[in-house]
């Protein structure tokens, strides 16, 4: 009679099933994390399910850094914290970690730890058709979910075509942003300096056909909480660029009447698109962090908002000796206003910036 076969599993990916297991998924994950193994764990996912008759069971996927040899069939046993009970799993080595992950994701509720490791031998990573993967990506609920699907199912495309994939998904998942609704009506700003009001009347008081080919921009400097941001954003449809420039179609539109440039340092704007934005240039390109260069229609003025002080003030920046050319250009393309008081009177607007 041959000796009984010794238990032995050798794999980078382990698929565990715990029948009739009442241990919560959080506790199961904690216990699996604490099990000592000679190979480091990289990822654990636990799924808590119930059969139609209400009977509970757990599934778990464990990914190791390299192949792990298990000769102890009790190694992955779980212990109840509420009663004297042990739960022993069915232990299998999984060639396709992605297939196991997809299987345990279908039903029940899951919890995970670590970073999922894409397996090049996975049926989802190689044998499954690209059409299936991309169809699933199109049906995802977000760009990030779609990228995750392609990373797991089409890793070659994800690595070699990431730039194009991301750019295409941004266009596919594009949703027109909800129009911004100002919290305060324009009529509540009663302390507008004459030069600012003249600028508003000159630009917004005309129809689009009667406006100049390259209207003048305006640079407004003032302390925080003077109402300059809320005033600028209450004038009409606009692009709001704050902190940095982003011409991604998700946040920038070519169909607005003006730009609001808020808290963007003059040094940063000089390195980017100073003359294009302040000079109302038409039909120019700007690069996005991801994706192809964006074509900007332009031809609209900018309201530049800044605080006084070194590094923030556009006036101080332009008055430096080394910038006479930029100074002369800017004063021909924009007017400067320095606020000495809030643009509003009501204390209800003290939160304005």
UniProtKB/Swiss-Prot annotation:
| Naturally occurring in which organism (per UniProt) | Bean golden yellow mosaic virus (isolate Puerto Rico) (BGYMV)
EC number assigned by the record: 2.7.7.-, 3.1.21.-
For the motif RCR-2, what are the positions?
57-59
Cofactor(s) it depends on: Mg(2+); Mn(2+)
Identify the residue span(s) of motif RCR-3.
103-106
Ranges where the record places region Oligomerization:
156-176
Written domain comment of the UniProt record: There are 3 rolling circle replication (RCR) motifs. RCR-2 is probably involved in metal coordination. RCR-3 is required for phosphodiester bond cleavage for initiation of RCR.
Give the protein family.
Answer: Belongs to the geminiviridae Rep protein family.
The domain of life for this entry's organism is Viruses
Report domain CRESS-DNA virus Rep endonuclease positions. Answer: 8-116
What does the cofactor field's note say?
A: Divalent metal cations, possibly Mg(2+) or Mn(2+).
Binding-site positions, a divalent metal cation: 49, 57, 59, 107
Give this protein's Gene Ontology molecular function annotations: ATP binding; DNA binding; endodeoxyribonuclease activity, producing 5'-phosphomonoesters; helicase activity; metal ion binding; nucleotidyltransferase activity; structural molecule activity
Q: Which UniProt keywords apply?
A: ATP-binding, Covalent protein-DNA linkage, DNA replication, DNA-binding, Endonuclease, Helicase, Host nucleus, Host-virus interaction, Hydrolase, Metal-binding, Multifunctional enzyme, Nuclease, Nucleotide-binding, Nucleotidyltransferase, Transferase
Taxonomic placement: Viruses, Monodnaviria, Shotokuvirae, Cressdnaviricota, Repensiviricetes
User: InterPro entries from the xrefs?
Assistant: CRESS_DNA_REP, Gemini_AL1_CLV, Gemini_AL1_REP, Gemini_AL1_REP_central
Region: Binding to RBR1, residue numbers: 143-153
Q: Which residues form the active site?
A: 103 (for dna cleavage activity)
Please provide one cellular component term from the Gene Ontology annotations of this protein.
host cell nucleus
Q: What Pfam families does its record include?
A: Gemini_AL1, Gemini_AL1_M
Q: Name one GO biological process term.
A: DNA replication
Binding residues for ATP: 222-229
Report the PROSITE patterns cross-referenced here: CRESS_DNA_REP
Chain location of the short sequence motif RCR-1 per the record: 15-18
Protein name in the entry: Replication-associated protein
Taking the first listed entry, what is the main subcellular location of this protein, grouped into a coarse class?
host cell
């Amino acid at each position: 009679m041959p000796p009984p076969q010794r238990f032995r599993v050798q794999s980078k990916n382990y698929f565990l099933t715990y029948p009739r297991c009442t241990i919560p998924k959080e506790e199961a994950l904690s216990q699996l994390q604490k099990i000592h193994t000679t190979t480091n764990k990289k990822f654990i996912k636990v799924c808590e399910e119930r059969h139609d008759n209400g009977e509970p069971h757990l599934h778990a996927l464990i990914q190791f850094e390299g192949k792990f040899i298990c000769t102890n069939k009790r190694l992955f046993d779980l212990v109840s914290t509420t009663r004297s009970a042990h739960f022993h799993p069915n232990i299998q080595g999984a060639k396709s970690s992605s297939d196991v992950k997809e299987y345990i994701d279908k039903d029940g509720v899951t919890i995970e730890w670590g970073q999922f490791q894409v397996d090049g031998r996975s049926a989802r990573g190689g044998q499954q058709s690209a059409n299936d993967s991309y169809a699933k990506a199109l049906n995802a609920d977000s760009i990030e979910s779609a990228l995750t699907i392609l990373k797991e199912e089409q890793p070659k495309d994800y690595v070699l075509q990431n730039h194009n994939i991301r750019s295409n998904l941004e266009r596919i998942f594009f949703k027109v942003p909800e129009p911004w609704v100002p919290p305060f009506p324009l009529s509540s700003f009663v302390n507008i300096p004459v030069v600012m009001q003249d600028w508003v009347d000159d630009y917004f008081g005309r129809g689009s056909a009667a406006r100049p080919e390259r209207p003048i921009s305006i640079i407004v400097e003032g302390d925080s909480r003077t109402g300059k941001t809320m005033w600028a954003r209450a004038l009409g449809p606009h692009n709001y660029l704050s902190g940095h420039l982003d011409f991604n179609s998700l946040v920038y539109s070519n169909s607005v009447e003006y730009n609001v440039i808020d808290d963007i340092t003059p040094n940063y704007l000089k390195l980017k698109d100073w003359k294009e934005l302040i000079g109302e240039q038409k039909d120019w390109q700007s690069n996005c962090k991801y994706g192809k260069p964006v074509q900007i229609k332009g031809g609209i003025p900018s309201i530049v908002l800044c605080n006084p002080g070194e590094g923030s003030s556009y006036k101080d920046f332009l008055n430096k000796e080394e910038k006479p050319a930029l100074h002369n250009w800017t004063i021909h393309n924009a007017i400067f206003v320095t606020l000495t008081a809030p643009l509003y009177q009501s204390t209800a607007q003290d939160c304005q910036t």
